[in-house]
Every structure is written in structure tokens, then in C-alpha cells.
Regions:
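Low-complexity, serine/threonine/proline-enriched polar segments
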Residues: 72-168, 330, 337, 451-517, ...
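Extended ligand-binding clefts on enzyme/binding-domain cores
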Residues: 307-308, 318-325, 339, 346-429, ...
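Generic recognition of flexible, low-complexity loop/linker segments
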Residues: 189-191, 249-251, 411-414, 515-520, ...
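Terminal accessory carbohydrate-recognition/targeting modules of carbohydrate-active enzymes
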Residues: 2-232, 238-243, 247-253, 257-259, ...
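Short, mixed-charge aromatic SLiMs
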Residues: 283-293, 355-362, 551-562, 618-633
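Glycine- and acidic
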Residues: 243-248, 257-265, 312-316, 406-412, ...
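C-terminal capping/lid segments that line or modulate ligand- or cofactor-binding pockets
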Residues: 309-337, 495, 508-513, 517-544, ...
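Aromatic-rich carbohydrate-recognition surfaces in CAZymes
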Residues: 252-384, 421, 541, 589-607, ...
């Protein structure tokens, strides 16, 4: 969950003047072709439209709690209407393609949006709530059932239409939503069916936020990208010159972690323009100390933040720095592009010399050096005294800090495994690579040179010492008992898991350490970070793929994918926090599978692994890709859950069950990774960061360019 900052006291924030200034589009370039596609997932019809200055995501939610929502990448804005709960389930039907429109508000200011026609079989629809504001406001209302009173809008009821409109809270151009009844009747805020039991609506949603500049065609992808149209559509909807959006509908703005992970996984198939847009967006938003911004509040969400903090109605973006993992993701991703990829290397000096933001100030090279300095300084304590107290912990008073950023995602842990055992050593190694390349020389002081010279040695200490603190060990008998008990509680078969366990004891890394340094024995998928970013000890590689890809609940593998967590070896109270209804529970996240798959390929490219380890890697690769191929229909979604019947796991869209704590985005940036991540990869030039010759998945034919490189 991308948790926001409910108040200025909840997390560290920084306002940055100048982020509102959009990167100017190339005015002479032709406009991208119209993008129009639909994803039906669970109870949601998701229709995505991008044409000219309009980009919009229409969500029609069926079931017993119907709603209509339109989210706009422009300003992370949206409009939505929630209808009263119904005893029976009803289903929307979209009639034809939505149309992109532009209108002027009452003061002559431009509004951009869509018009769509939809029908539903229902006796009536009683309007319960209407919101026109930031998507953050709509998202929080959907999750928490509350919205700021300041964003309310009064309805204007006519004979056959009801509409809401208002300016943004700072007086800027705002939002409009109109429901025109094309079939049925309207009585106040109650829409009634015609004699045939159907309701027809013409839905118009508009925003006054400035449009973004779409990345498309060769400005987005090169010829090595998979031909998967669903993934291409998703990426095209989320990619802009100003930034890459994390997902839709709920995360239609910048998220540092999502940007960096996606850029790394997609790097072989992204254009130079797209990779540099991603990196530039992160560098632009770094704090003065070099911290990576987790999320930005823009548009009306920024206005609301300022109203709460200082009483002003400023729209200057507000940046949130509460996460810790992003600080250690920037270096390995930047190094992969600027040092290891021949395309990026040829452009690196000019890229780093450019200003880090539209307001001027420091260069990108200076900003990157600030981040690397932060990484190195934070690593010194553990290198001197390698104990839990000197690991990288969550920030004081904040319960989240890595990608598992729901309140229970780390099981109450304070020291995440992924940050300490994978990302810190990877960041230190990357800092060493970038220093040795000479790219950073214009930006480093004499003191920096001394500090950066320690990077490789610090990386080795962290690589050797940190994982040991997370080690969990169960005897064979204890592991069997835990697996049987947990399988019974879930109503799933234990036999495949027990068979996969074989005769040995069970060892795996803990998800996190608690505040006292004790391991939390949740099995997890985060070893994928280490597989992708580092040259691991062969024994660690073997343990990662052997243990994690065992059948659940001995490991993480199911027929519907690799789960991101397995609490079988925890107390029942902890198991309850990691259910298949929990956002970071026993569910499948598409990008985590892609990360692990890419990591396996990277390890297979090594020449120093024993034959037995390579054999285990190859077997793990076959197992993982069988699940990836079997779930290709949902691979562009954020995550999914599962059901179990007749001895088999089945995909269950996350957010469809009443017990699900949230819903999945139908379009997620890092879930498009399969445009680049394939079953086998042969590096051409500079390792996994360079252009790649690829043999695609079975369902995707090999392109001519790929064939020429084989």
C-alpha cells in the first residue's frame, strides 16, 4: 500500500518549489496515437483512454457497492460517485468507447476529460457520496470511508441530469462530474430504472489540472520489447516525460521505489529518453541530504497539506521521505544505466551535468553524489560493529519503510531483510562502480574521495554479515508440524509441501528483525533483490531458489504464482496478519515474480557457480515460469489472491472479496516488467544492464531483431 501522510507530523515532508513546472513537450513532434483499451478484473471494468491532452481511467465497479470513478494522471486528480449498498449484486455494462473532450469552465479555463455511456440492471441507484478532488482523497475515502469536508460539492439537479463542479481549493481550475440519465428517471439524488429494469447513464468527468506529456512509440520502447499488447498499453498509459506513474487508478503519480524498480527491470527495452526521464524524476525530488522521495502530493492534495500545516492554500508539491528502501535503490539502478549499459554510459556525463530540476540549483551529478554519500555514511556503523542495532531500521515513529508498506506488511518488524541484506550491499557496490568509472569526479570533494574509496570494503562486510542476523532454522520435525497445522487452517493440501521439504531441516531468512533484533519467521520473496543486484555466495543462491520455490506452505510456490509471504512458521496471531486478504499477505505480486525471474537469469549468467547450484537455478526457473505463464491474464495487475478447490489453487482478483483490505490496480508500472524479463536472456555487451538478446516466453514470438542477436 502506498501510504500517504495524513498530517505533517506523520512523516518527514519537504516542499519543493518548481516541481509544478512541467518538462516541456517536444512541440514539433506528432501527438501520440490514441490509446484506448479495457481491462475487466474482478468487479471492475477498467477503461483507459489517452488522446491529445486527455488521459483518463474510467472505473465502473459492480457488485453490492457500485461506484463510478474517473482518475486523471493530470494532477493526480479524479472524480467519483459512490452509490448506496445493495443486497444483491449488479453489473455495469460499458456502451461503446469513451470520447475524449475539452471544455471551458465558467471562467474560460480549459478542462479535459471523457464522456462515456454505461448501463446497469438495477431498480435504482441512490447516490451516497460524490468526490471531486485528488485521487489521494478518493483513494482514502475508498479505504477509510472519510474525506475532508473542504472538498465537498453541491449537486445541481435538472430534469434528467445531476452534476457537480467546483474550483480547486486554491481557486485554480477544478473539476466537473455529470450523470445524465439516458434510460430511466431521476428523482433528486436517486436514479430509477425504466420499465425494463435498466438504467442508462452518460458519464462526463473533467479536470482542470495541467496535462502531462506522454511518452510513446520509440520514445518509450526499443525494438527488443515484447509484443505483449496488454503490457505495452499499460506502460504507455503510465509513462510521461515528467515522470512514470506508479499505477492506476490509485497511484497515478510519482513513487520513487516504483520508478526505480520498474526502470531497472524494464531497462533493456526502454528507450534512452524513458530511462533518463525515470532517473531524472527521482534525482529532481531528492532531499538536500540525498534521500529518495517516496511519494509526492500534488494538485489539490498539496493544497490540503498546506492548509493543514500552515493555513495557506499553496499548491507547491509536498514530498514524503518516510521510506528507507528508496535510498538504497537509486545507486544500483543508476549504476546499471550510467556505467554498465553502453547506451547510458555514452550519455552519462551530459546527463549528470544537467540541472536536477526545472528551478535550477544543483546538478544531477551533485544530487546523485548526495545520495551516495548518505548511503556510505549510513553503512559505516554496521561495518564497525555488525550487530542488529547498527542495521538500517525504520524511521522513528513510522511503521513502514520498504515495499511492504501496509501496517502489518513487516509483521511488526523494524529492520527489513530486503533493505539490509540485499539493497545496502548492492548500493555500496554500485557506489564503488560509479566512483571507479570517473563519472562522479566533478562532484566529489577530497573528503568524499576518501569516503567513497571505502565503498567496496563496506559492501563486502554488509554482504557477509547482515544476512546472518536474519537466519531462521527449524528441525525437520518442527517444520513438518508447522506445515501440517497451517495447511489445515487454510484448508489446503499439505502433501505437496511435505514432499518438497524432503528429509532435511529448514533454513530461510526472516522477513525482518523486531526492535530487539529477534527474527520474525515469515518466509518471503525478497531474496529476489539480492539475486538481481548482487553476485551472491553460491550457498546463498542455492538456498534462495531451493527453499522459496518449494510448494506452499513449505515454500512460496502455488499454481497461481509465487506468494510474497508465508507465515506457516509463526504464531497464529501473526499468521492472521498475512492472510490471502492482506495486501502483503499470502498473495502474488506480479513484479515480485518478475524480479525473482530476472535475478535467476542474472545468476545463471555467472561462470563461477557449481554445477549443482546451476541445476537448481534452472529447475527453479522452470517452476517459476510455469506459474508466470499460467497467470499471464493478470500479469499487468498489481497483485492477486487465490482460492482453493478440488486440490487446486485458482486466481482470485484482489479486492473482489469482502474481506480484502483493498483492491488491486488494473494497471501497475512494475507489473509491465515482462516486456523485458524473459525466460532466458543472453547478454550482449555489458551484462544485464546492457542491450539484451532475448528468447521470449512460449506465448510470445521472437522478433527479428532478437533473432539476429542470437
Amino acid at each position: 500500500m502506498k501510504l500517504g501522510c495524513p498530517s505533517s507530523l506523520a512523516c518527514a515532508m519537504l516542499t519543493v518549489a518548481g516541481l509544478l513546472a512541467a518538462v516541456p513537450a517536444a512541440a514539433l513532434e506528432p501527438a501520440p496515437a490514441r490509446l484506448d483499451y479495457q481491462v475487466d478484473e474482478g468487479l471492475n471494468i477498467n477503461r483507459f483512454v489517452r488522446e491529445g491532452s486527455v488521459a483518463a481511467h474510467l472505473v465502473l465497479r459492480s457488485g453490492s457497492d457500485p461506484r463510478i470513478l474517473i482518475a486523471f494522471p493530470a494532477g493526480d486528480s479524479g472524480v467519483g460517485v459512490w452509490f448506496a449498498h445493495r443486497s444483491g449484486k449488479i453489473r455495469w455494462m460499458l456502451q461503446g468507447a469513451p470520447r475524449a473532450i475539452q471544455r471551458l469552465d465558467g471562467r474560460g479555463r480549459a478542462l479535459h476529460g471523457i464522456v462515456a455511456d454505461a448501463t446497469i440492471e438495477a431498480a435504482d441507484l441512490q447516490i451516497r457520496q460524490v468526490l471531486l478532488s485528488s485521487v489521494r482523497v478518493l483513494r482514502d475515502y475508498q479505504s477509510l470511508g472519510a474525506a475532508p469536508a473542504a472538498v465537498g460539492a453541491r449537486p445541481v439537479v435538472q430534469a434528467r441530469a445531476i452534476s457537480w463542479s467546483r474550483d480547486r481549493l486554491d481557486g485554480a481550475a477544478g473539476y466537473q462530474l455529470t450523470l445524465a440519465v439516458t434510460h430511466g428517471g431521476l428523482r433528486g439524488e436517486r436514479i430509477t430504472a425504466a420499465s425494463d429494469g435498466r438504467i442508462g447513464l452518460r458519464i462526463t468527468g473533467l479536470t482542470g489540472e495541467p496535462p502531462l506529456s506522454a511518452l510513446a512509440g520509440k520514445d518509450l520502447l526499443n525494438d527488443l520489447a515484447s509484443s505483449d499488447s496488454a503490457a505495452r498499453n499499460t506502460l504507455a498509459f503510465l509513462a510521461y516525460r515528467e515522470k512514470l506513474l506508479a499505477g492506476s487508478w490509485r497511484f497515478q503519480t510519482y513513487f520513487g521505489r516504483d520508478t526505480l524498480i520498474s526502470a531497472r527491470l524494464l531497462m533493456p527495452v526502454l528507450s534512452e529518453t524513458a530511462v533518463e526521464a525515470a532517473l531524472a524524476s527521482v534525482l529532481e525530488r531528492l532531499s538536500p541530504q540525498g534521500e529518495v522521495a517516496h511519494e509526492e502530493d500534488i494538485g489539490e492534495r498539496a493544497v490540503l497539506d498546506h492548509m493543514e500545516r500552515d493555513g495557506s492554500r499553496s499548491a507547491v508539491p509536498v514530498l514524503d521521505y518516510k521510506m528507507v528502501d528508496g535510498n538504497y535503490l537509486l545507486a544500483p539502478v543508476a549504476s546499471a544505466w550510467l556505467v554498465r549499459d553502453e547506451r547510458g554510459r555514452s550519455r552519462a556525463a551530459a546527463f549528470l551535468a544537467a540541472a536536477a530540476g526545472p528551478a535550477g540549483g544543483r546538478t544531477r551529478g551533485a544530487a546523485l553524489s548526495a545520495n551516495l554519500r548518505l548511503v556510505l555514511q549510513s553503512a559505516i556503523g554496521f561495518a564497525a560493529q555488525p550487530d542488529a542495532a547498527h542495521l538500517i531500521g525504520l524511521k522513528r515513529g513510522i511503521a513502514v519503510g520498504d515495499w511492504r508498506d501496509s501496517e502489518s506488511g513487516l509483521g511488526g518488524g523494524r529492520y527489513p531483510y530486503d533493505v539490509n541484506a540485499a539493497l545496502v550491499p548492492a548500493a555500496l557496490a554500485a557506489a564503488s562502480q560509479m566512483k571507479e568509472s570517473g563519472l562522479l569526479s566533478p562532484y566529489l570533494s577530497a573528503e568524499d574521495e576518501t569516503l567513497f574509496a571505502r565503498a567496496a570494503q563496506l559492501a563486502q562486510v554488509w554482504r557477509d554479515k547482515a544476512p546472518r542476523l536474519f537466519a531462521i532454522h527449524f528441525s525437520h520435525r518442527a517444520a513438518e508440524d508447522a506445515i501440517r497445522s497451517y495447511a489445515v487452517s487454510l484448508g489446503v493440501a499439505s502433501e505437496p509441501a511435505l514432499h518438497a521439504l524432503a528429509d532435511g531441516d529448514l533454513t530461510f531468512p526472516a522477513l525482518a528483525l523486531d526492535g530487539a533484533g529477534h527474527p520474525i519467521p515469515v518466509m518471503h520473496s525478497d531474496e529476489g533483490f539480492a539475486l538481481l543486484f548482487d553476485d551472491l555466495d553460491p550457498a546463498r543462491v542455492d538456498e534462495a531458489v531451493t527453499v522459496l520455490l518449494r510448494a506452499f506452505p513449505a515454500g512460496l510456490m502455488t499454481e497461481v504464482g509465487m506468494l510474497v509471504a508465508n507465515p506457516a512458521f509463526c504464531a497464529p496471531s501473526v499468521q492472521a496478519s498475512f492472510s490471502r486478504n492482506a495486501y502483503h499477505g499470502t498473495v502474488v505480486w506480479s513484479w515480485q515474480q518478475a524480479l525473482f525471474a530476472a535475478g535467476v537469469v542474472r545468476q545463471l549468467a555467472r561462470s563461477d557457480l557449481p554445477a549443482a547450484v546451476r541445476a537448481h537455478l534452472a529447475a527453479a526457473q522452470r517452476t517459476l515460469w510455469a506459474a508466470i505463464d499460467a497467470t499471464s491474464s493478470v500479469s499487468n495487475s498489481e497483485l492477486w489472491s487465490w482460492s482453493y478447490a478440488d486440490g487446486h489453487y485458482q486466481i482470485a482478483p484482489f479486492g473482489s472479496a469482502a474481506a480484502d483490505v483493498d483492491e488491486s490496480d488494473a494497471a501497475q508500472l512494475w507489473s509491465t516488467a515482462y516486456l523485458a524479463v524473459r525466460r532466458t536472456v543472453v547478454a550482449v555487451g555489458a551484462a544485464s544492464g546492457a542491450r539484451l538478446a532475448v528468447r521470449t516466453r512460449a506465448r510470445d514470438s521472437m522478433t527479428a531483431n532478437e533473432a539476429a542477436l542470437q
